């Protein structure tokens, strides 16, 4: 655990840098993730200066550098920012993405949840150049931008709602309004926990509510989760395991838990 960012341990030789770094650390802690480019704009300094400041802050355990910016030190957040979690199990997530994208057919309407594994689905879907007339409904702003490259083969509908910067997601208020009026071919929903008894769970309540609405809006309900999520239980329940049509995970998942999930009535497929 680190301490709340402040001036302690910073050289007093450059008062402007002292104040700027303290404020940068505060932004990282308050927002969960801060981009180098955004910090440069806020403080009116170059990206080189921001990177130097973040490196100095990391050396004092005030922040942790990640690609493109910084997050709070490890262990301080129950929920990791998108930019941090995308580097966890990347090969497994990529395999799941290709597997899931292979299920989509021309003419399908697809609901695609926010998250790093669902982002892998979006990237794999872009590469399926033979698909036509596919509509993707998403609450992930980054996913919408990933799919923009495939327009007009793939039409993108953004759900609307209230922005959660930590995951670039849209939630309630107004996050489920559109979903309540849809009937999609399939929904691909991510999560932080898949347990045969508790069901599908997520680390935060606002997104769990949207995830449930996504599943209810689809004829086929698919959970995508790398092996580290299988057997885990988090704060917010999304649904029971028997409400899920299919779980796509990877071979690193605990085989005993996978067998229990299958026995509970949920089909399981291992990608990769």
What residues fall within each predicted segment?
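HTH-adjacent hinge/linker in prokaryotic transcriptional regulators
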Residues: 2-114, 120-132, 149-153
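Conserved helix-loop-beta element of the AMP-binding
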Residues: 132-134, 247
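Conserved SAM/SAH-binding loop
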Residues: 118, 140
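Rossmann-fold dehydrogenase core element
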Residues: 134-135, 156
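Conserved phosphate- and dinucleotide-binding cores of soluble alpha/beta proteins
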Residues: 2-39, 44-47, 59, 141-272
């Amino acid at each position: 655990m680190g301490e709340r960012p402040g001036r302690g341990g910073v050289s007093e030789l450059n008062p402007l840098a002292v104040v700027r770094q303290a404020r940068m650390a505060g932004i990282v802690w308050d927002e969960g993730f801060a981009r180098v480019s955004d910090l440069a704009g806020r403080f009116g300094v170059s990206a080189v200066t921001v990177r130097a400041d973040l490196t100095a802050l990391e050396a004092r355990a005030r922040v942790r550098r990640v690609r493109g910016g910084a997050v709070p030190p490890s262990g301080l957040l129950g929920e990791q920012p998108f930019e941090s979690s995308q580097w966890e199990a990347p090969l497994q997530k990529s395999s799941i993405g290709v597997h899931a994208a292979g299920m989509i057919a021309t003419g399908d309407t697809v609901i695609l949840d926010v998250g790093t594994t669902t982002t892998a689905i979006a990237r794999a879907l872009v590469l399926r150049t033979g698909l036509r007339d596919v509509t993707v409904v998403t609450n992930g702003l980054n996913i919408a931008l990933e799919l923009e490259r495939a327009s007009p083969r793939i039409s993108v509908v953004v759900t609307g709602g209230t922005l959660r910067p930590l995951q670039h997601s849209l939630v309630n208020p107004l996050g489920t309004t559109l979903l309540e009026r849809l009937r999609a071919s399939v929904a691909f929903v991510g999560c932080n926990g898949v347990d045969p008894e508790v069901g599908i769970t997520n680390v935060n309540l606002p997104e769990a509510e949207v995830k449930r609405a996504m599943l209810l809006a689809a004829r086929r309900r698919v959970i995508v989760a790398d092996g580290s999520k299988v057997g885990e239980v988090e704060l917010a329940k999304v649904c029971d395991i028997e409400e899920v049509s299919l779980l796509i995970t990877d071979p690193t998942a605990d085989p005993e838990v996978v067998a229990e999930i299958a026995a509970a009535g949920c089909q399981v497929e291992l990608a990769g």
